[in-house]
């Protein structure tokens, strides 16, 4: 999820752009984390783990979307009232932050295998914060440009 906001999309590459952006951003984030925390990187596992983070990135977005969908749909399931479900679905910024937390847990734990010795809890929290901050940046700066377009409310 983090990669969408930091590396621009190149239309000429098509779907392959997703793979390049995801790999580059995950590798940059892990390298920066290793430098900041002075963690030791396993030179053999690092490229393998960053390659495996690409499909996990997509899976984390799907998992976060399912969690958000479950939360939005819960009032309808419990009380049969669709109005609250419709109101919650309009505010994607809050649900995007929830997606970022779920994605941060999945990616942070998986990324910990690229290090020889690392505090997994700290890495997961760092990944969750990075995803949440990038989601809030998009919600604050880019969502207002979509005013009037469903599902955004202005």
UniProtKB/Swiss-Prot annotation:
The keyword Lipid biosynthesis does not apply. Coiled coil: none annotated. It is a multi-pass membrane protein. GO terms for cellular component: plasma membrane. It comes from the Archaea. Its main location: membrane. The keyword Transmembrane applies. The chain crosses the membrane at residues 15-37, 58-80, 95-116, 123-145. It is found in: Cell membrane. Keywords: Cell membrane, Membrane, Transmembrane, Transmembrane helix. This is Uncharacterized protein AF_2166. It comes from Archaeoglobus fulgidus (strain ATCC 49558 / DSM 4304 / JCM 9628 / NBRC 100126 / VC-16).
